[in-house]
Amino acid sequence: MKILIIFIIFIISYISGFEIPKGFGIGLVIPDAECLNYIGDPIDQQLCNSKLQNNGDRIYTTTNSQIDSQTNIKKSFEAITFLQDQCKDLLFAQFGICDIYLAPCIEVTLTPLKSISLPQRFCKSVCDRMVSNCPRLEEQMDCSNSFLFPEIGTFYDLSPYGYTIDNGTFAVPCSDPTIFFNQVSSNSSFIEICPSPLLLKNSSDPEYAANKGYSYLSPSNCVLPCPVPNYSNQKWDQLLTMSKILSTISFILSLYNVLTFGIINKKVSDPHKCTCFFSGSIALVNLCDIITYGIGYEELLCPEPGRSAKQQLDPVCGLTGAFFHLGITYCVLWSMTMGLVLYCSVKRQKWFKFNYFLIGNTTFTITTVVIAAATSKFEAGLGSIECWIRDRWYAISLFWIPCGIALLIGSFCIIAVIHEVYKTSKKSISNRNDLLQRELKPLLIVIFISGSFLYLFIFFFDIERKFGGYRSAVEDYVLCLLNGSQEECFTTGPSYVPYFLFYLVIRWFGIIFFLFYGTSNIARKIWVQNKIWKSISSSISPKSTPKSSPKNSDSKINSNSTNNNNMILNDNNDKNLNEKKAVELESIKIN
């Protein structure tokens, strides 16, 4: 395009026989152009109202050119908003940009009834000043182009329009807004514009301080939207839908385990207590999700545009964050305790005291919750679907390191249990199939508990390792927005599939424990022996039997109940092996 313009100017000069004086450029005449007043800035965006010479009177205007110019000015202002740490005198640059796109206009009278409008092009000296103060502007401004940036002025050939003075040429001096800038700059301010979906906030205003949940993109006052656009809206919807469905199911099944092993169970053993507390912990984690989607994910996590929820400003975020931390920490500690219970049972050790672990687990968990709450560390953060501890060192100190140690202990205990099961079975049972059947359940527990938490650990520390790269990649996101391409722009973050799996793992524990424990033989026996269940069975049984007297009916029910109890006892006697080791193995398998 630039070569084409130079070629046209050369042809015009050659045909007219006019020699261009030094310091001047040759301009093209647009017959339909007019000198009009500035239409004014858009209602919702300040641009050039206070930055135009002569208050914006007589602006060179072609068809829709002022609207198009405003679009270009807005894009230029967006770009230099992010150059504040690389450039100086950017306020002057904005005056220059307004003068370039909304050029002053001179009207030349050709005849009493006819005139033509010509633009005053931007002076090269002013262009050089802008580029020297901000070298990045050189990418968009070629100050050596005399057509756009003449040193003195621009010659226009008006002979085709009937102008005869000076061989039909008319000289228009270049525009220099320096004097005007010096007069009004003290009353003018630099205009920051953030490309959508970034939002403009005043970081110096305490109401919009960074510690209130705003994520500023230095050196500007632009903040990232909430939630952060790491993924498309479709992927966010998939993640939130998964969370709603799994959390609800997991919550119900966890309560079932608590009811079965902790409330209606007549003989609550130590393994049953561990199962009960573990399931209760998972229910607490899922309750946070239920509260969150009950209120609304964006309403709770992003209470204001561009602001993520913080404990000190958003009490519900602090409450759900405390519940989540209490639940997930308790969950890890009780998984460790379950491993110790199984190990002591197989080794026939007497040192395990359940109440000690109950006090220890509860004390540690509550202490970490109190520390996090007292220091206001519960917040939504960037790109998350629940409130929790987002401060890096607090999260590592209060959860990942201590709970990682607990998981390691629990995993070693469960591995030791499997080893003891193998040794005992080898001595007393020769059938390999029976050996595999006995080891299958604890082996699956190891895979699902330890493996799941191991994935959470790896994912978290992998994000921490790459966090610096994610932050530096924000520049690419901003460039994508500034380029105005048709493609959707995203910030750089964790890959979607591992991120989705991270939240999936946290929410499947209730379902997994129901499959392990809620469907076990001992769970069914607990319900069969429950008084309420018996009364329901008794009320249903007569309806399916022939008519008889009440006494006979009661006698049959009692007889059936007695027979059922005898059958259960006989089944239990059949299942108990003569050797004590085999009995212990059966107990481990059930629990």
From Swiss-Prot:
Gene3D superfamilies: Frizzled cysteine-rich domain, Rhodopsin 7-helix transmembrane proteins
Stored InterPro entries: Frizzled_dom_sf, GPCR_2_secretin-like, GPCR_Fz/Smo-like
Residue numbers on the Extracellular membrane side: 18-244, 297-321, 375-397, 464-495
Signal peptide per UniProt: 1-17
Localization terms from the record: Membrane
Gene: fslF
Family named by the database record: Belongs to the G-protein coupled receptor Fz/Smo family.
Domain FZ as annotated: residue spans: 30-177
MF GO annotations: G protein-coupled receptor activity
Covalent S-S links between cysteines: 35-105, 48-98, 123-174
Amino acid composition bias (Low complexity), ranges on this chain: 538-571
Glycosylation sites: 167, 187, 202, 230, 483
Residue spans, topological domain Cytoplasmic: 266-275, 343-353, 419-442, 517-591
Major place of residence: membrane
Name of this chain's protein: Frizzled and smoothened-like protein F
Pfam families: 7tm_2
GO cellular component terms listed in the entry, alphabetical order: membrane
The entry's keywords: Disulfide bond, Glycoprotein, Membrane, Receptor, Signal, Transmembrane, Transmembrane helix
Region called Disordered, residue ranges: 538-573
Chain ranges passing through the membrane: 245-265, 276-296, 322-342, 354-374, 398-418, 443-463, 496-516
